[in-house]
Every structure is written in C-alpha cells, then in structure tokens.
C-alpha cells in the first residue's frame, strides 16, 4: 500500500510540474489594444540597445526562436528606429535586406559588436563593408537589394507593424498579437535554465487564444 501511495504521489508531482501555467503580470502581460494582421511571434530589438546585445550574446535569442519554435509559426524579428537617431533607419534597412537574403544570423552579432564594443559603425559605407565581408554577398547583389522597391515596401510594413504596437522599449516580444514578454522582467524570474523556460513560455502563449 505504501509503495502504491509513493508511486501515485510521484505521478501527481510529475503531472503538476508538466501542467504548470505561467501567470499574467508575472512572466507576461496582456496588451489591452486589439492588434491584428501581425505575425504570431514578434520580436523587437535595436543594434543600439546594449541589453539586446547582451541577451543575444548570452542566449543566442534569434537562433533559439528559429530552431525551437514550430516552423509553421510565423516569426518576425523587427529592428526599431527609436534608438540611435537617423542612422537607426539605415540599420533597419540593412536588417530587412539581411532577412530577405536569409543571412541575418551572419550579420547580427558582427554589427552588434562593432556598435556596442568597437564603435566603428557611423556611416552607410561601414555597414556595407561589414555586410559584404560577413555574408560573402557581392556588391552588385547588395546594391540591387539596397535599391529594391520590394525592400522599400518591407520597410514600410516593418514600421507599420511597430506603430500598431506603439512600442517604446526593447527588447520585447509579442505573441499572438496580445501577450507581451518583457525580457528585463523575465531574466529576473528565470534565474536558471533561461533558454528552456523562455521557449516553454512562448509555446504556452502560442497555445492561448
């Protein structure tokens, strides 16, 4: 009888752990406004944000989301323009070009490092040189994308989506157009196994309506 009780108790503990639900106003908050026609997972950052750099350097957020979330889920990473002045718009354009060419993981950390540690990027030519060097893309391909009407439209969509959110700080994630994840708060809550808990939280919010 005692052995049966122990087994049942173990099953109960296992079920409790696996069925744990994250809490509103703790691991996430609910956006009051209705945000429609946006990707399921929206991740916002800036190359001018020191904390964005630290998160990416420690946890490899971009790759983590891409590899651990179901490929059928629409995920979009946005570079915001409200940090870094006018040059921020250049970086937004570079980021969108990188996404279109599927080389964003090759340029993300190099650009972060040059801005946050080396302070070597201050002109369009600087960023172009880094892009070409790290991706192996030739100048003609780069210039074609730089002057592309498609890129202009994607920049407009990028800015429109950000305006819908009325975002004023990064890094931030929004899931299903309403669940807001604040990384500052999250890192304090997830003191251990951040990556695992972070992905679990995203999947939990994706399952909510």
Curated annotation (Swiss-Prot):
Keywords: Disulfide bond, Redox-active center, Signal. Disulfide bonds join 49-52. GO terms for molecular function: oxidoreductase activity. Residues 1-19 form the signal peptide. It comes from the Bacteria. The keyword Signal applies. SUPFAM superfamilies: Thioredoxin-like. Belongs to the thioredoxin family. DsbA subfamily. Involved in disulfide-bond formation. Acts by transferring its disulfide bond to other proteins. PANTHER family: THIOL:DISULFIDE INTERCHANGE PROTEIN DSBA. This is Thiol:disulfide interchange protein DsbA.
């Amino acid at each position: 009888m005692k052995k049966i009780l122990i087994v049942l108790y173990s099953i109960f503990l296992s079920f409790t752990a696996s069925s744990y639900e994250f809490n509103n106003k703790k691991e996430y908050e609910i956006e009051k406004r209705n945000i429609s026609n946006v990707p399921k997972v929206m991740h916002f950052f800036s190359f001018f944000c020191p904390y964005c750099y630290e998160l990416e350097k420690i946890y490899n957020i971009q790759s983590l989301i891409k590899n651990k979330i179901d490929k059928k889920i629409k995920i979009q990473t946005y570079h915001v323009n409200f940090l870094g002045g006018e040059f921020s718009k250049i970086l937004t354009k570079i980021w969108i070009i990188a996404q279109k060419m599927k080389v964003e993981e090759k340029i993300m950390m190099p650009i972060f490092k040059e801005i946050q540690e080396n302070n070597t990027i201050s002109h369009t030519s600087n960023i172009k040189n880094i892009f070409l060097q790290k991706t192996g893309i030739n100048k003609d391909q780069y210039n074609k994308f730089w002057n592309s009407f498609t890129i202009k439209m994607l920049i407009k969509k990028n800015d429109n989506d950000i305006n819908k959110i009325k975002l004023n700080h990064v890094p931030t994630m929004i899931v299903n157009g309403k669940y807001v994840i604040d990384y500052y708060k999250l890192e304090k809550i997830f003191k251990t196994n951040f990556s695992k808990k972070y992905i679990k939280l995203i999947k939990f919010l994706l399952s909510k309506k």
